Amino acid sequence: MPPRKTDPENRAGGTRTVPRMCMEVISLDNEKTVSSALRESWGRLAVPSLFLLGVIYYEELFLKLYCFRTLSPESAVFTFLFTLPVAMLLGLLCGGVSPRRGRILLPACTALVSLWIGTQLVYYHMFKAFLSIFSLTKMAMVVQSFGETAVGNVLASWFPISMMAAPTVLAWSFRARLVPDGPDAGGGRRLRWAAMAAAVQLISMGLVLLCGGGVLSLRYIYYRTATPDLEVQNFGVFTQTQLELKRVLFGIVPDDPDVSQEPAPDMAPPDLEPTLPPPDSPPPESDAFRPEVIPGYHTLPVDFDTLIANEEDEGLKSAHLWFSQRSPTPENLWTGYFEGKNLIWIVAEGFSTLAMDPQRTPTLWKLSHQGFVFDNFYTPLWGVSTSDGEYVTTTGLIPKSGVWSYSLSSDNYMPFSLGNQFRRDGYSTFAFHDYLYNYYDRDRSHPNMGYDYYALGQGLELESGDNFPPSDLEMMEKIVPMFVNKDKFMVYCLTVSGHLTYTLDTNAMSVRHWDAVADLPYSEEVRCYLACQMELELAMESLLSQLEAAGRLKDTVIVLSADHYPYGLTDEQYSELLGHEVDPVFEIFQNTLILWSGDMEGTAVHVDKYCSSLDVMPTLSNLFGLDYDSRLIMGSDILSPADPLVIFANYSFINGVGYYNSITDQFTRWDGGEPDPEEVAAMVAEVQNRVAYSGAILDTDYYRLVLEHAGMAGP
C-alpha cells in the first residue's frame, strides 16, 4: 500500500487546513451577519421614526387645511423639514430602548403628539387662536370655568378629533412591527442618530435663512416676528411651540431701530367739525367743541441720553434708543376737553357693530351715533382672547405672544393706567366684572391698575351668577349705587353676557331674549348671539337711567368697546349678519367705539381716521388732560394728527397710506399707486418694533426703570 501523501501545509501541526474557498464563504457569511445586525440596529431607530414622521406630518397638514383652508407648497416643504428632526428624536426615544419598553412608548408618543395637535386644532376652532404653553399652566382654572363649553366643542368637533385619534390606534395595533426585535442600537448609534436630527434641524433653519424674498419673508417670520398663526401656517405646530418658548425665555427680537428719525413738527389738528344731527333728532344742547389750543407734546421729562450712556444691558439700551427717537404725540384742540368729568369705561364681551339695531338696541344705537363717532375703528383679536383684549384697550400696549400679559403685569409699575391716573387726581376708582373674580388673575392685575376690584366671589353677588353667562343688567343694577354718589368717580367694567357659545342649550342670556329674535332671518347661532347682546342693551339703559336719576349724567363720560369680535360665530355665520361674505383679514375686525358724554346729547363728531382698541387709552388720557408719555405707549391719541396705524396679530396692518395683508405679503395703497418695497419694509419694521418693545416693557418692568430714573416712579 503506497504511503499517504502528506499535505505540506499540514505537516507541522498534523491538522487539516480549511480550503481558501471555504474561508471566503465563511467571511461572506460573517459580513452578511454583521450587515444584517447593523440594518436591524439602525432599523430599531428608523422604523419608529418614519412612522412618527408620517403621523406628525399628516396631522400638521390636516390642521392647516382644517383651520386655514389653504396649503402652500413652501408650507408643505418646511413643515416636512421641521417635522423630521422631531420625529427622529421621538423615534430615538422609542427605538433606543428595549423592544418591550419601546412598544409602550411608541403608542404613548403618538397619543401625546396627536393630543397636542388635536388640542390646538379644537382650541383654534373655538377661539381663533392657538393655545400657548403658558396657558397650560392655568388649565385647571380654564377647565373649572369653561369645562362644559369645552366638552361641547370637543363633541361638535368629532370629525377632526377622530382623524387625530386614528394614528394612535394604528401605533397600538402595529407596535410589534413598528418596534421590531433585534440587537440594541448601542450608545454610539443613538448619539449619531441624535446628531443627525440636530443636523437636519440646522439645515432646515439654514434653508429658511435663504428665503428672504418679499417684505414679510419666511426668514423674517421665523427669526423675528411673534405671529403664531403665520408660524403654524408656514412651519407647523411643533415649530411654533419652539419659537414661542424662545420668545418667552429670551424676548422678541426687534428690528434695528432707526436712530435718524427726528420728532415731527407740531402739526395742525385734524378737521373734526361737529356733524349736524338729522332733522328728526333733538337739537344739540352744547356746541362748545373748540377748546383753546394748548401747544405742546404728551411727554414726561425722561433723560434717555443718560439712560443710554449708563446702560450695560444691550437689550435695554436698544429700548432706550428706540423710545427716545419716537415722535411724541402733540396736544390738540381736544386736549383736556373732558377734564374734571367722571368716566365709566366698559369693555363689552363679544360686542359688535352688527349686534346693534335702532329697534332692538335703541340705547346702544343712540350712544354709537352721538358723541364722538369713529367710522374706521377695529378690535383686532389677540392670542389670549378677552384678557389680551382688555390689556390692549386699557394699557395701549400690544400683548406678548405666548403668555398672559395682563397677569404678568400685576407686579409691574403701571403709571399710565387710568385707574392709577384718576386715583392720583382724587377720584374714587372701581373695577367690576360679572364673572369669577380670579379668572385670568384679574384679582392681581386690576388692583395693580389702580382699582378697587369687585367680581363674583369678591364683593359682588348676583342671582344670575349660578348660570352662564351671568346678567350684565343685574350687575349694573348692583354696582351703580356703589359709586354714583361719590364726589368724583372713574369706573372700569368688563361685561360677560355676550360670551360664547351661542346656542339655546348653553347660553342663559340667549334663552332670556329669544322671543325678541326668534323671527329674524338668521341661523339659530346668529339669533342666539343677537339675543345675548340684548342683555348689554338693558345694562346700558339701566346705567343711563340711574345716572340721570342721580343727576350725574351730564358730567359723566361713557366709553364702550369690544374685547374682540364674536369669534364664537363662524365666518359663514358672521357673513349672515353682514349680508355678504366677510373678509377675514380686515373686515371681520371692524367694530364700534362708543365715546359719549351727557352734554353731547344729539351731536356727533365724526372721525374717519383709522384706529383700534390700542388707541383708546391714550385718546382718553388726552381728553381728560392726564399726564403721560406718548413715546412709551404703542397706541396714539385718535384725535391727534399722529399717523394712524392699526396692527393685527398676524402683522397685517392699516395706516394712512394703505393696508398690508401679511398672508399674501401684499401692500395696497389707498391712492392706487405702486407701493415702494422699501417703504413697506419700513412699515413692517415699525410693527415689529412696537410688538417687540411692548414685550420689553412687560418683561423688564420698563416703566418703573425709566420713571424711577426721572424721579417719578411710584411704589
Over which residues does each language-model region extend?
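Residue-identity detector for glycine
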Residues: 13-14
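Intrinsic-disorder-associated, low-complexity terminal segments enriched in Asp/Asn/His/Tyr and depleted
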Residues: 7-10
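Juxtamembrane/interfacial segments around transmembrane helices
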Residues: 132-137, 157-170, 243-258, 666-670
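Extended, compositionally biased non-globular segments that define protein topology
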Residues: 2-4, 21-163, 168-210, 715
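Solvent-exposed soluble domains appended to multi-pass membrane proteins
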Residues: 309-715
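Intrinsic-disorder-associated interaction segments
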Residues: 27, 31, 38-39, 51, ...
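Membrane-interface segments at or immediately adjacent to transmembrane helices
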Residues: 208-332
